[in-house]
Amino acid sequence: YYKEGPFILLNHTGMLDDCFTCAHEAGHSIHTTLANANQPVATADYTIFVAEIASTFNEQLLLDHLLSKTTDKETRLVLLQSAIDGLIATFYRQTLFADYEYQAHKLVEEGKPVTVDVLSSIMKDLYLEYYGIDLNNEPYKEYVWAYIPHFFHSPFYVYQYATCYASSLQIYDMVKNNVPGALDNYLNMLKAGGSDYPVEIVKKGG
């Protein structure tokens, strides 16, 4: 795998989501290619805290390209709605889930009982706080925690989606607006692989 080049596996059906998935995965591939080319095998691999920056950067690049190429009102609305949905799902929803995870683990640390009702109550409170949505009117949604595998197999993983997304938009904005050194900083961040602490690597990107 190291120095052999990444592979993208994608069932492309010609839908808009497929195009964005392709751009997303290409971001990971570019990241891997640059890291492998500039780092020894011991520090080429990067963490999730950095990984989703390149992928979402590419999604934003594709979005801007498509918006610049179409004047059709309905197509533009679909593209903008897709971007809004992505923002909600990647930033706000994942932040809510991270908050939920913290509160659930805190119960265990404090020796308090952890039951289905307690866990669902936390989710209901957070949906009301984050979205103003009363889950009493949406039965079963309070159990969303039960089918999110990250909570059970990869604790404290989901917050990184939100941090990467925020970092990616900041870096993309600087590159798009031709801030001096922004593109080089971004590429150097990708080339860094896992050669430093994740936060320090992200700082290199801007």
Task: Cite the ranges covered by each PLM segment.
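C-terminal, non-catalytic "cap/extension" segments appended to globular domains
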Residues: 22, 30, 68, 94-101, ...
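Active-site-proximal, well-structured secondary-structure segments within enzyme catalytic domains
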Residues: 1-9, 80-96
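Short, surface-exposed loop/turn segments at secondary-structure junctions
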Residues: 39-46, 74, 110-113, 180-183
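Post-HExxH zinc-binding segment in Zn-dependent metallohydrolases
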Residues: 35, 45-74, 83-85, 89, ...
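Short pre-active-site segment immediately N-terminal to the catalytic Zn-binding motif
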Residues: 3-23
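Catalytic Zn2+-binding segment of zinc metalloproteases
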Residues: 27-41
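Short, solvent-exposed segments of well-ordered alpha helices
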Residues: 13, 17, 42-49, 87, ...
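Internal glycine-rich alpha/beta core junctions
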Residues: 19-30, 49-50, 54, 61, ...
